[in-house]
Amino acid sequence: MNLKAKILDDKAMQRTLTRIAHEIIEKNKGIDDIVLVGIKRRGVPIADRIADIIEEIEGSKVKLGKVDITLYRDDLSTVSSQPIVKDEEVYEDVKDKVVILVDDVLYTGRTCRAAIEAIMHRGRPKMIQLAVLIDRGHRELPIRADYVGKNVPTSKSELISVNVKGIDEEDSVNIYEL
Protein backbone atom coordinates (compact mmCIF):
# COMPACT_ATOMS: atom_id res chain seq x y z
CA MET A 1 0.00 0.00 0.00
CA ASN A 2 1.33 3.40 -0.96
CA LEU A 3 0.12 6.62 0.64
CA LYS A 4 -1.46 8.67 -2.11
CA ALA A 5 -2.66 11.70 -0.12
CA LYS A 6 -3.59 12.98 3.31
CA ILE A 7 -7.20 14.12 2.99
CA LEU A 8 -7.75 15.46 6.53
CA ASP A 9 -5.37 16.24 9.38
CA ASP A 10 -6.47 16.71 13.00
CA LYS A 11 -7.51 20.36 12.61
CA ALA A 12 -9.40 19.73 9.37
CA MET A 13 -11.17 16.76 10.97
CA GLN A 14 -12.24 18.90 13.94
CA ARG A 15 -13.60 21.61 11.60
CA THR A 16 -15.45 18.95 9.60
CA LEU A 17 -17.04 17.40 12.71
CA THR A 18 -18.03 20.87 13.93
CA ARG A 19 -19.76 21.58 10.61
CA ILE A 20 -21.61 18.25 10.75
CA ALA A 21 -22.75 19.04 14.32
CA HIS A 22 -24.12 22.42 13.20
CA GLU A 23 -25.90 20.81 10.23
CA ILE A 24 -27.51 18.20 12.50
CA ILE A 25 -28.81 20.88 14.88
CA GLU A 26 -30.07 23.05 12.02
CA LYS A 27 -31.80 20.28 10.06
CA ASN A 28 -33.51 18.88 13.16
CA LYS A 29 -34.34 22.27 14.71
CA GLY A 30 -32.53 21.37 17.92
CA ILE A 31 -31.60 18.12 19.61
CA ASP A 32 -34.69 17.12 21.62
CA ASP A 33 -35.60 13.96 19.69
CA ILE A 34 -32.12 13.03 18.45
CA VAL A 35 -30.20 9.86 19.25
CA LEU A 36 -26.70 9.63 17.75
CA VAL A 37 -25.80 5.98 17.11
CA GLY A 38 -22.17 5.26 16.26
CA ILE A 39 -21.47 2.23 14.09
CA LYS A 40 -18.56 0.34 15.63
CA ARG A 41 -15.64 0.67 15.27
CA ARG A 42 -14.68 4.19 14.26
CA GLY A 43 -18.23 5.50 14.04
CA VAL A 44 -18.49 5.32 17.84
CA PRO A 45 -15.70 7.80 18.69
CA ILE A 46 -16.83 10.03 15.81
CA ALA A 47 -20.38 10.04 17.26
CA ASP A 48 -18.92 10.82 20.71
CA ARG A 49 -17.01 13.79 19.29
CA ILE A 50 -20.06 15.11 17.42
CA ALA A 51 -22.08 14.76 20.66
CA ASP A 52 -19.45 16.77 22.57
CA ILE A 53 -19.54 19.53 19.95
CA ILE A 54 -23.36 19.60 20.02
CA GLU A 55 -23.24 19.90 23.81
CA GLU A 56 -20.87 22.88 23.52
CA ILE A 57 -23.23 24.55 21.03
CA GLU A 58 -26.60 23.71 22.62
CA GLY A 59 -25.64 23.55 26.30
CA SER A 60 -27.24 20.13 26.79
CA LYS A 61 -26.30 16.54 26.06
CA VAL A 62 -27.54 14.64 23.04
CA LYS A 63 -28.51 10.99 23.57
CA LEU A 64 -25.81 8.57 22.43
CA GLY A 65 -25.67 4.93 21.50
CA LYS A 66 -23.75 2.43 19.43
CA VAL A 67 -24.41 -0.54 17.22
CA ASP A 68 -21.86 -3.32 16.84
CA ILE A 69 -21.66 -4.60 13.30
CA THR A 70 -18.90 -7.09 12.74
CA LEU A 71 -18.04 -6.55 9.13
CA TYR A 72 -15.45 -8.18 6.97
CA ARG A 73 -15.62 -5.16 4.71
CA ASP A 74 -15.35 -5.83 1.03
CA ASP A 75 -12.84 -2.99 0.76
CA LEU A 76 -10.61 -4.53 3.44
CA SER A 77 -11.18 -8.29 3.27
CA THR A 78 -12.83 -10.97 1.22
CA VAL A 79 -13.77 -13.22 4.15
CA SER A 80 -17.44 -12.25 3.81
CA SER A 81 -19.31 -9.83 1.61
CA GLN A 82 -22.11 -9.24 4.13
CA PRO A 83 -21.93 -7.38 7.44
CA ILE A 84 -22.80 -9.41 10.52
CA VAL A 85 -24.83 -7.64 13.20
CA LYS A 86 -23.94 -8.85 16.69
CA ASP A 87 -26.62 -9.04 19.33
CA GLU A 88 -24.61 -6.68 21.56
CA GLU A 89 -26.13 -3.44 20.29
CA VAL A 90 -26.39 -0.89 23.06
CA TYR A 91 -28.21 2.36 22.50
CA GLU A 92 -30.96 4.59 23.75
CA ASP A 93 -34.61 3.81 23.15
CA VAL A 94 -35.21 4.71 19.51
CA LYS A 95 -39.02 4.66 19.45
CA ASP A 96 -40.29 7.91 17.92
CA LYS A 97 -36.76 9.40 17.91
CA VAL A 98 -34.65 10.77 15.09
CA VAL A 99 -31.81 8.26 14.94
CA ILE A 100 -28.64 9.54 13.31
CA LEU A 101 -26.31 6.72 12.36
CA VAL A 102 -22.66 7.83 12.41
CA ASP A 103 -19.89 6.06 10.50
CA ASP A 104 -16.41 6.86 9.29
CA VAL A 105 -16.66 5.90 5.59
CA LEU A 106 -19.66 5.32 3.33
CA TYR A 107 -18.71 2.93 0.53
CA THR A 108 -21.03 0.15 -0.70
CA GLY A 109 -23.84 0.93 1.76
CA ARG A 110 -23.91 -2.59 3.22
CA THR A 111 -22.75 -1.56 6.69
CA CYS A 112 -25.41 1.14 6.83
CA ARG A 113 -28.12 -1.29 5.67
CA ALA A 114 -27.18 -3.74 8.44
CA ALA A 115 -27.20 -0.93 11.02
CA ILE A 116 -30.65 0.22 9.86
CA GLU A 117 -31.92 -3.34 10.22
CA ALA A 118 -30.51 -3.54 13.76
CA ILE A 119 -32.16 -0.23 14.69
CA MET A 120 -35.53 -1.34 13.29
CA HIS A 121 -35.41 -4.53 15.37
CA ARG A 122 -35.09 -2.40 18.51
CA GLY A 123 -38.02 -0.09 17.82
CA ARG A 124 -39.60 2.18 15.26
CA PRO A 125 -37.80 5.50 15.05
CA LYS A 126 -39.51 8.58 13.69
CA MET A 127 -36.68 8.90 11.16
CA ILE A 128 -33.22 7.51 10.45
CA GLN A 129 -30.52 9.82 9.12
CA LEU A 130 -26.90 9.07 8.23
CA ALA A 131 -23.77 11.09 9.03
CA VAL A 132 -20.41 10.04 7.59
CA LEU A 133 -16.98 11.58 7.76
CA ILE A 134 -16.07 10.39 4.23
CA ASP A 135 -18.28 9.40 1.28
CA ARG A 136 -16.13 7.59 -1.26
CA GLY A 137 -18.85 6.52 -3.71
CA HIS A 138 -19.22 3.05 -5.28
CA ARG A 139 -22.64 2.33 -3.76
CA GLU A 140 -24.15 -1.11 -4.23
CA LEU A 141 -27.36 -0.14 -2.42
CA PRO A 142 -29.55 2.97 -2.69
CA ILE A 143 -28.07 4.62 0.43
CA ARG A 144 -27.28 8.33 0.70
CA ALA A 145 -25.81 10.22 3.64
CA ASP A 146 -27.68 13.22 5.08
CA TYR A 147 -24.48 14.70 6.50
CA VAL A 148 -21.14 14.28 4.72
CA GLY A 149 -17.83 15.55 6.02
CA LYS A 150 -16.04 15.19 2.71
CA ASN A 151 -16.85 13.58 -0.64
CA VAL A 152 -13.78 11.73 -1.89
CA PRO A 153 -14.33 10.04 -5.25
CA THR A 154 -12.10 6.98 -5.38
CA SER A 155 -11.25 4.09 -7.62
CA LYS A 156 -11.81 0.56 -6.39
CA SER A 157 -8.02 0.16 -6.20
CA GLU A 158 -7.83 2.85 -3.51
CA LEU A 159 -8.40 2.56 0.22
CA ILE A 160 -9.56 5.27 2.61
CA SER A 161 -8.01 4.99 6.07
CA VAL A 162 -9.66 6.95 8.90
CA ASN A 163 -7.60 7.36 12.06
CA VAL A 164 -9.34 8.55 15.22
CA LYS A 165 -7.67 9.45 18.52
CA GLY A 166 -8.63 6.93 21.16
CA ILE A 167 -8.29 4.06 18.71
CA ASP A 168 -5.37 5.39 16.69
CA GLU A 169 -2.45 7.69 17.49
CA GLU A 170 -3.84 10.68 15.60
CA ASP A 171 -6.86 12.13 13.84
CA SER A 172 -6.38 11.85 10.10
CA VAL A 173 -7.87 10.57 6.88
CA ASN A 174 -5.54 9.15 4.24
CA ILE A 175 -6.00 7.61 0.83
CA TYR A 176 -3.82 4.69 -0.23
CA GLU A 177 -3.19 3.06 -3.59
CA LEU A 178 -3.47 -0.72 -3.28
Swiss-Prot record:
Q: What class of enzyme is it?
A: transferase
> Could you give a single Gene Ontology term from the biological process aspect?
DNA-templated transcription termination
Q: Where does motif PRPP-binding map?
A: 99-111
The protein's UniProt keywords, in alphabetical order, are: Glycosyltransferase, RNA-binding, Transcription, Transcription regulation, Transcription termination, Transferase
Q: Name one Pfam family in it.
A: Pribosyltran
Report the superkingdom from the record.
Answer: Bacteria
The entry lists its GO molecular-function terms as:
RNA binding; uracil phosphoribosyltransferase activity
The reaction(s) annotated as catalysed by this protein in its Swiss-Prot or TrEMBL entry are:
UMP + diphosphate = 5-phospho-alpha-D-ribose 1-diphosphate + uracil
Query: Where does the chain bind substrate?
Result: R41, R42, D103, D104, V105, L106, Y107, T108, G109, R110, T111, R136
Alphabetical list of Gene3D superfamilies matching this protein: 3.40.50.2020
Q: According to the UniProt entry, what is the EC number of this protein?
A: 2.4.2.9
Q: Which PANTHER family match?
A: BIFUNCTIONAL PROTEIN PYRR
HAMAP family this protein is in?
A: PyrR
The family assignment reads: Belongs to the purine/pyrimidine phosphoribosyltransferase family. PyrR subfamily.
Q: What does this protein do?
A: Regulates transcriptional attenuation of the pyrimidine nucleotide (pyr) operon by binding in a uridine-dependent manner to specific sites on pyr mRNA. This disrupts an antiterminator hairpin in the RNA and favors formation of a downstream transcription terminator, leading to a reduced expression of downstream genes. Also displays a weak uracil phosphoribosyltransferase activity which is not physiologically significant.
Subunit and partners: Homodimer and homohexamer; in equilibrium.
* Name of the protein in question: Bifunctional protein PyrR
Question: Could you tell me which species this protein originates from?
Answer: Clostridium acetobutylicum (strain ATCC 824 / DSM 792 / JCM 1419 / IAM 19013 / LMG 5710 / NBRC 13948 / NRRL B-527 / VKM B-1787 / 2291 / W)
Q: What is the lineage of its organism?
A: Bacteria, Bacillati, Bacillota, Clostridia, Eubacteriales
Gene name as annotated: pyrR
